[in-house]
Amino acid sequence: MKKSIILLMLLSVNLFPQKIGFQSFGLSIPLVGSLADYKIEKHGGNVSKENYESKSTFEGGLLLKAGYSFILKQNEPYFISLLFDFGYYRDTFGFMNYINNRKEVNVFDSLNMGFFAEGLFGFFTLGFGGGIKVPLGGSLRYDNIIELLNYGRLKNRFDDLYIPYIKFIIGLRYDSAYAGGGSSLSFYFNYDFQKIKVKGVEPDIQRLCSIDLGVQIGFHFGSYEYID
């Protein structure tokens, strides 16, 4: 019996001599243009979509990633990473307000929390993820005026103060086994779901959402150099 157990252990070592993966860490910087929209539900009030016109704005963030990468091909950059996505993100929602005849930009400085899955296939990278962004502060910008808003003042202006999102990247990535990491440049797409609700327009319901397009710069840390 003991000999059988020892033989089984030796066979296991010979059949599975390689690692299945490694810990991964990264830093990503999305730099994007955002096109916002108001989703309006009419319930007999005075809110009209004709009073607002979407305007493009700029936004970005700084996100840390940590997780585990599963090797698809030994000693080559082919693996899939499952990552926790955490950091700072600035969301902007810009409109031309024809009621006040001015451009207005709602800015939310948010804590970003989510998950991200990314595959590396040689030099080609593909990823998707989702989560929520929780605004902790922000501002309202109009007529060269910046009105700063802390969390309490944001709560006075908006209900349901969190932003569910999904995102997708596709691009190029170079990793070096000797350097223990690499860098990437990707096309970036993000959609912010219509959750944040504007106060003061009752009985109508007015929510913010946006589509974001741009690029993401990434820095990656982890090694796929293994011993056969």
Where are these regions (language model features)?
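Gram-negative (and chloroplast) outer-membrane scaffold detector with strong preference
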Residues: 29, 33, 60-147, 166, ...
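Solvent-exposed loop and beta-edge segments used for protein-protein assembly and interaction
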Residues: 19-21, 58, 74-76, 107, ...
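Predominantly the C-terminal beta-signal and adjacent terminal strand-loop region
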Residues: 22, 36-42, 48-52, 158-228
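Intrinsically disordered, low-complexity segments enriched in glycine/proline and serine/threonine
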Residues: 5-6, 22, 121, 219
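Short glycine/proline- and aromatic-enriched beta-strand/turn motifs that initiate or cap beta-hairpins
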Residues: 17-78, 218-228
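Flexible, solvent-exposed loop segments that connect beta-strands
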Residues: 35-56, 88-109, 138-161, 196-207
